[in-house]
Design a protein with these regions (language model features):
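Alpha-crystallin/small heat shock protein
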Residues: 1-101
Length: 101
């Protein structure tokens, strides 16, 4: 495998169809919504935040955004961004998860 940056994000309870991944200018943006499940009753402790979120992750190396891939399994998002041989021109690329938008 060529050298790559690997980004792993914990996203428990997030529907992968509600995730958007964008790589541009040495930044990976992970955005989406964690919806509150229909729960009833009283809770002593709730450790999940709900609602829209966005994370901007700086990338240490220039990456080949066109060859990026992502996998979402059991609440864990793994993004693989191959390191570019030379600095690419700045472009914004939407990364699909497991072949789905």
């Amino acid at each position: 495998d060529p050298p790559a940056l690997h980004v792993v994000v914990e996203l428990t309870g997030v529907d992968p169809n509600e995730l958007q991944l964008v790589a541009a200018d040495r930044v990976l943006v992970v955005a989406g919504v964690r919806r509150r499940p229909p729960l009833s009753g009283r809770y002593q402790q709730m450790e999940l935040e709900y609602g829209p979120f966005q994370r901007r992750i700086p990338l240490d190396e220039p990456v080949d955004t066109g060859a990026a891939s992502a996998r979402y399994e059991l609440g864990i998002l793994t993004v693989v961004l191959p390191i570019a041989a030379q600095a690419p021109r700045v472009e914004r690329v939407l990364i699909t998860i497991g072949g789905r938008l």
